[in-house]
């Protein structure tokens, strides 16, 4: 009871599972679940498949670009998913924002080359005070600076619109919020 929010009279459980292979969702009455992984700890098929070893999990959806798994953006390539797929990625927020527009432009006019720029809240990889960092720009105090950095958005677009990624460059500006 202490591990749940009651929403519209139904419990939504917070189930701690440090080792996904040992998680037992059936103990909470959960069977054939779609597990949504936004932990950041698992990013490829091998790691994400650990969730499928837990009791009660049928499919896994990653909320970031994944390696070795289909990266799906609704309105772009959702028809590529088959019912037999058990692990898929919903790509990234940037990929979901730009891919539908790029698909329409590319399909109707073609794209020779382009640049993607995303403005994003600073992340936990940045320092809160000016400090050393392997990527010197990220060493700037996150809450006080706009930091230009790289993003994998161009490569991620290529996973849902094949051939387009080689035509795109991309960068991100991490900003205080």
Describe the function of each predicted region.
Residues 108, 113-117, 125-177:
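C-terminal substrate-binding/catalytic lobe of Rossmann-fold NAD(P)-dependent dehydrogenases
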């Amino acid at each position: 009871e202490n591990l749940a929010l009651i929403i519209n009279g139904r419990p939504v459980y917070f189930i701690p599972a440090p080792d996904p292979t040992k998680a037992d969702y059936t103990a909470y009455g959960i069977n054939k679940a779609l597990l949504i992984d936004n932990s950041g700890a698992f990013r490829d098929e091998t790691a994400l498949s650990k969730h499928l070893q837990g009791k009660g999990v049928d499919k896994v959806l990653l909320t970031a670009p994944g390696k070795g798994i289909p990266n799906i953006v609704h309105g772009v390539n959702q028809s590529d998913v088959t019912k037999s797929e058990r692990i898929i990625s919903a790509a990234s927020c940037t990929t979901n924002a730009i891919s539908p527009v790029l698909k329409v432009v590319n399909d109707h006019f073609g794209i020779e080359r382009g640049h993607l720029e995303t403005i994003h809240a600073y992340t936990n990889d940045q320092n809160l005070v000016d400090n050393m960092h392997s990527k010197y720009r990220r060493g700037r105090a996150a809450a006080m600076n706009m930091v230009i950095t790289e993003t994998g958005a161009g490569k991620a677009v290529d996973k849902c619109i094949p051939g387009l990624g080689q035509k795109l460059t991309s960068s991100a500006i991490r900003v205080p919020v």
